[in-house]
């Protein structure tokens, strides 16, 4: 299943509606007549790509492996440049809420939502995982998602080679794409 993200991001998406973020679900089939509810954990996967593209090897391939391991999975293909921070953090927060809202339908344990990311996607996962309680995410959750900040907090993080180093060792290209015209203001 694919879905376009839009709630709370309408003004952002008016600029380039064809570049909206998408969510793709990978949900194991349920057979309620033959099995008890399993309440699987779910992994939200954020592929890397320097905020310029989404690496194909870090999306569906990871989701299929998670299914094999007993998890349900969602791939969040978040907005890329020219969209800049904090758009992607809002999209990740929306995705956590969306998964929790569908937990019963998908036989997912709503208290076992893991946010995973690779490279730039790891940066995004780390951002929501550490910033969910701050004013920016809390006000977005309340105003646009109609929920408390705790509802968009991931229950765990899985970070694969995240782009989280700043200063002279930072992966500059990722941060240029993420911050756009605000690059000089925020980079160090």
Where are the predicted features?
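Short beta-strand element of the alpha/beta-hydrolase
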Residues: 39-48
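A short loop-to-beta-strand scaffold at the N-terminal edge of the catalytic core in hydrolase folds
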Residues: 17-34, 41-42
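A fold-wide structural signal in alpha/beta-hydrolase
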Residues: 41-42, 67-77, 114
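Short beta-to-alpha linker loops that shape the active-site pocket of alpha/beta-hydrolase fold enzymes
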Residues: 29, 49, 72, 77-81, ...
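Catalytic nucleophile-loop/oxyanion-hole region of alpha/beta-hydrolase
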Residues: 54-56, 61, 76-110
């Amino acid at each position: 299943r694919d879905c376009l993200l839009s709630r709370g991001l309408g003004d952002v998406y008016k600029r380039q509606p064809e570049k909206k973020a998408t969510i793709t679900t990978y949900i194991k089939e349920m057979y309620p007549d033959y099995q008890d509810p399993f309440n699987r954990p779910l992994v939200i996967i954020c592929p890397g790509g320097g905020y310029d593209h989404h690496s194909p090897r870090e999306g569906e391939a990871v989701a299929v492996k998670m299914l094999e391991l007993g998890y349900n999975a969602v791939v969040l293909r978040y907005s890329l440049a020219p969209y800049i921070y904090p758009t992607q953090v809002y999209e990740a927060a929306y995705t956590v809420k969306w998964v929790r809202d569908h937990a019963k339908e998908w036989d997912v344990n709503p208290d076992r939502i893991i946010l995973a990311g690779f490279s730039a996607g790891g940066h995004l996962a780390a951002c929501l995982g550490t910033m969910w309680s701050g004013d920016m995410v809390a006000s977005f959750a309340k105003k646009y998602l109609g929920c408390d900040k705790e509802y968009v907090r991931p229950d765990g993080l899985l970070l694969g080679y995240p782009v989280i180093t700043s200063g002279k060792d930072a992966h500059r290209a990722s941060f240029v794409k993420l911050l756009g015209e605000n690059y000089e203001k925020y980079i160090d």
